[in-house]
Amino acid sequence: GRNDKGGMSQLTFFNGDRFYTLNTVTSAASELYMLRLGANDPDFNLRPSTAFLVREPAAKDHTFVTVIETHGHYDILKETSKDLKPLCKDVRIVSDDAAKTVVEVAYGDYVLTLTVDHKDASKTGYAVLKK
């Protein structure tokens, strides 16, 4: 699949009694794949597993950013679900160079800014701002 506009792509799945959403920064050139590992194993030596892959075919140096959000709940006795929709509104790379990477995550009424210093890990940090 593709997100021709770029920005953020989301994939929500259900596991156990919870919902999980992968919020991934993508570009218009990004290729998104749902995979089934072990599907072509004629001897059935591999455990069948599913996977999600983001590929940047033309990139030589690329930063991948994915935020995994746990949300919602399925009540097996009542057969009802609540909070199915993720609260993450946006994930974006503000800046990215050899020195540091800055990412913003809009979540509900808050914006989380994450800074990763590639040269000095002690300068890596985060800040939460209310809109």
Locations of regions flagged by a protein language model:
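CBM-like, beta-strand-rich accessory domains located in the C-terminal region of large
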Residues: 1-131
